[in-house]
């Protein structure tokens, strides 16, 4: 039976009748006035500014209100640490003086202190009783551990020492071969004056020589100029501004330790702020600059990524110690406007980079960009003028921030809608003067005339890009899209649409045809968007992967291996077409861009060709060369292939429409059921259907679509299973292109040779490639 634990006496001390001299404590509190309290100033959000004359706000806690008996002044009862120091000192001196007075003689012989000590002694005895059992248990455990350690030491001594055969004249040839395999010669970067650390990183990343935009921009940025850079997509604009930022970091913050103190964190400010129009581009910029930092020695730059869909609290913590900030305008403005002191930090940045500037600065988009730019240029009025502040202001005036602007299109006419009526600009590109006036109205440059760099003033498209046009009926775009996929079986394809609903439908349609399709649009959760991009761009992904996306993937995404771009819808603006097509043929690689054009879209396509290729067409016509490059080549698909594929597409569309209609119907029923529950009425789906049928929308706009959706959603499970079985049977066969299946040896075609050829295994027969 275990020993019963001794009980500790709770109240062993009794109050002494003799008044003792006791030190004054702040537990009881002091009665003070409102001006004697130690008020603390409340930090207001940066966005509040002066709030129409609001000067400030102070607060205090742990204070009780003491109301006077008559009409006297209201007092406050506060602890000693809530009172101002000079007031607290005077109160403590008065208290000690009063406590030191003689209080008379008591009849009690034993003082209270002795009783307290005796109670403590009893407590320590109880502790000793408990610790003896604990010590016995600990000693047993320790002895077991010691025995195990002794056995392990004996076993280690018994084992013979490993023998190493040391050979004379060790060669480092294997090490040299490994280094040569990982790194490349970067002597082409020497004229730009880049540091050895960054050259090491460029060598590991296999960037042997700079691109034209990098050669032109890096020296100007390093010398302190504002730069506006225009270059075609995939020309390396990220490194054009990333390398000078890291060079500044090496010169000023190379040996700077990581700050942990609040005062040090509050005094630190970021070096650069990089704005991006989309989350995917912001993540890509962060990935590229991080790779440049991690592969370079002595560069420990901390990069903060501020995008929507992720935790705000985590981003605020990372921002406190960041050197480079990359973000989208919406989330960046939310963090700055609700934070304390963040706006003052960002006003001290050295580099402001606006990537894809024509999109960020376009009219009617990204209102937060204007607010951010206005906040960065705002000067505080209410501050104390001291010598330190004056010196800081002088330093800020001596070294204001550099503004760096990059994009592939600066032509304002390219942002006009292609469809509809209206007056259109000519297709010529903006010259240097017009582009500078367009940007000077939006941005506050440090220099009167920033340096404008245009490495391809004539053509906006990549040199190795092939552009094609497929004319098809509007209701058969799915058929022609699937046919193009069959012509390019081992090509990584990016399909662009103008709506989110089209992305959802096409993704399900292609998946029903056993094609590895992924979706990407702005309504997806951020983790789902990142997952789609990662699966599509992974080196281990299927080489036939298809990404169906809206224009969120049109700008800045640098995914290696994209061979084909298909425009399912004609883009709304010409600059969108330029950036869509720029996802392929990047960094001297080749690629194709094919536009599916319906008869009602021919006007928009003609305007598109006039805007994008006007300068190149004019230059080619004025040249003496006989060959003239057409803007968009017409692509002719084999009609036999389209006829053979049509049954597959029809079955896949029926299955897809049924799934989408059923999903839409269930969501509508859920909404009506929840609304009926809120109103307290019974929900009957058949009654609602009868009422809707009575109203009738057969001839109105959308009536036919609703009828088709209802018919597609009313299919039974058996009918859907039958359609899937038929489609599965068709997909299991090759598309026959002129081979007799009944008499295999009667024709002039050698079927065995066709099966042995390792070409396009989708077709059975000779099918020509799409060459344009």
Curated annotation (Swiss-Prot):
Any Pfam family matching the protein: DEAD
EC number(s) reported in the record: 3.6.4.13
Enzyme type, top EC level: hydrolase
RNA-binding among keywords: yes
Stretches assigned to the Helicase C-terminal domain: 480-638
Disordered, as annotated region: 1-27, 88-146, 690-715
Positions with a binding annotation for ATP: 231-238
Location within or outside the cell: Nucleus, Nucleolus
SMART domains membership: DEXDc, HELICc
InterPro entries, A to Z: DEAD/DEAH_box_helicase_dom, Helicase_ATP-bd, Helicase_C-like, P-loop_NTPase, RNA-helicase_DEAD-box_CS, RNA_helicase_DEAD_Q_motif
UniProt short sequence motif DEAD box, positions renumbered to this chain: 355-358
Domain of life from the UniProt record: Eukaryota
Domain notes: The Q motif is unique to and characteristic of the DEAD box family of RNA helicases and controls ATP binding and hydrolysis.
Protein name per Swiss-Prot or TrEMBL: ATP-dependent RNA helicase MAK5
Gene designation per UniProt: MAK5
């Amino acid at each position: 039976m275990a020993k019963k634990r001794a009980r500790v006496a709770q109240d062993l001390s009794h109050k002494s009748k003799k008044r003792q001299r006791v030190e004054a404590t702040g537990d009881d509190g002091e009665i003070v006035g409102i001006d004697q309290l130690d008020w603390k100033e409340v930090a207001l959000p940066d966005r509040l500014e002066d709030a129409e004359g609001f000067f400030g706000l102070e607060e205090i806690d742990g204070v009780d209100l003491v109301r006077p008996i008559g009409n006297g002044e209201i007092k406050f009862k506060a602890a000693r640490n809530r009172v101002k120091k000079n007031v607290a000192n005077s109160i403590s001196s008065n208290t000690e003086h009063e406590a030191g007075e003689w209080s008379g003689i008591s009849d009690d012989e034993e003082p209270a202190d002795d009783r307290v000590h005796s109670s403590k002694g009893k407590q320590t005895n109880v502790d000793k009783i408990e610790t003896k059992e604990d010590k016995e248990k600990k000693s047993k455990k320790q002895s077991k551990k010691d025995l195990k350690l002794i056995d392990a030491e004996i076993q280690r001594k018994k084992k013979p020492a490993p023998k190493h055969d040391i050979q004379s004249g060790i060669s480092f040839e294997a090490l040299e071969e490994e280094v040569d395999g990982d790194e490349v010669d970067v002597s082409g970067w020497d004229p730009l004056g880049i540091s050895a650390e960054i050259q090491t990183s460029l060598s590991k990343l296999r960037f042997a020589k700079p691109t034209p935009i990098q050669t032109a921009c890096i020296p100007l940025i390093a010398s302190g100029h504002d730069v506006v850079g225009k270059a075609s997509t995939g020309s390396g604009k990220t490194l054009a501004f990333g390398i000078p930022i890291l060079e500044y970091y090496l010169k000023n913050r190379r040996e700077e330790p990581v700050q942990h103190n609040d005062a040090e964190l509050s005094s630190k400010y970021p070096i650069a702020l990089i704005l991006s129009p989309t989350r995917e581009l912001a993540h890509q910029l962060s990935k590229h600059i991080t790779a440049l930092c991690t592969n370079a020695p002595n560069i420990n730059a901390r990069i903060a990524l501020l995008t929507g869909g992720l935790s705000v609290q985590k981003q605020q913590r990372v921002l406190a110690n960041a050197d480079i900030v990359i973000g989208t305008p919406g989330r960046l403005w939310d963090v700055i406007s609700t934070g304390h002191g963040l706006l003052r930090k960002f006003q001290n940045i050295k580099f402001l980079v606006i990537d894809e500037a024509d999109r960020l600065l376009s009219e009617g988009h990204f209102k937060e960009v204007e607010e951010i730019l206005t906040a960065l240029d705002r000067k505080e009025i209410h501050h104390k003028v001291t010598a330190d502040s004056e010196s800081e202001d002088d330093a800020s005036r001596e070294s204001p921030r550099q503004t760096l602007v990059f994009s592939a299109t600066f032509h304002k006419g390219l942002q006009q809608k292609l469809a509809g009526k209206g007056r259109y600009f000519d297709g010529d590109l903006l010259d240097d003067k017009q582009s500078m006036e367009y940007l000077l109205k939006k941005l506050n440059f440090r220099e009167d005339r920033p340096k404008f760099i245009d490495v391809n003033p004539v053509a906006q498209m990549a040199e190795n890009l092939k552009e094609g046009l497929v004319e098809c009926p509007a209701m058969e775009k799915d058929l022609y899209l699937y046919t193009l996929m069959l012509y390019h079986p081992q090509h990584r394809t990016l399909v662009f649409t103008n709506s989110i609903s089209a992305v959802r439908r096409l993704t399900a349609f292609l998946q029903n045809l056993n094609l590895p399709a992924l979706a990407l649009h702005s309504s997806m959760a951020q983790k789902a968007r990142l997952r789609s991009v990662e699966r599509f761009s992974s080196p281990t992904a299927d080489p036939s992967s298809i990404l169906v996306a809206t224009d969120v993937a049109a700008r800045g995404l640098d995914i290696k291996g994209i061979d084909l771009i298909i425009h399912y819808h004609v883009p709304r603006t010409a600059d969108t077409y330029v950036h869509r097509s720029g996802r392929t043929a990047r960094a001297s690689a080749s690629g194709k861009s094919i536009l599916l054009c319906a008869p009602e879209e021919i006007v928009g396509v003609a305007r598109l060709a006039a805007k994008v290729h006007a300068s190149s067409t004019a230059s080619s016509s004025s040249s003496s060369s006989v060959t003239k490059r057409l803007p968009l080549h017409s692509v002719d698909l084999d009609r036999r292939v389209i006829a053979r594929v049509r049954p597959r597409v029809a079955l896949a569309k029926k299955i897809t429409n049924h799934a989408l209609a059923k999903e839409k119907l269930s969501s509508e029923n859920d909404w009506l059921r929840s609304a009926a529950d809120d109103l307290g009425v019974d929900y009957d789906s058949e009654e609602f259907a009868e009422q809707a049928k009575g109203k009738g929308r057969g001839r109105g706009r959308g009536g036919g679509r609703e009828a088709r959706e209802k018919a597609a959603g009313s299919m039974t499970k058996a009918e859907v299973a039958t359609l899937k079985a038929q489609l599965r049977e068709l997909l299991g066969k090759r598309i026959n292109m002129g081979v007799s299946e009944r008499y295999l040896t009667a024709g002039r075609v050698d079927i065995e040779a066709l099966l042995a050829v390792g070409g396009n295994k989708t077709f059975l027969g000779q099918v020509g490639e799409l060459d344009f």
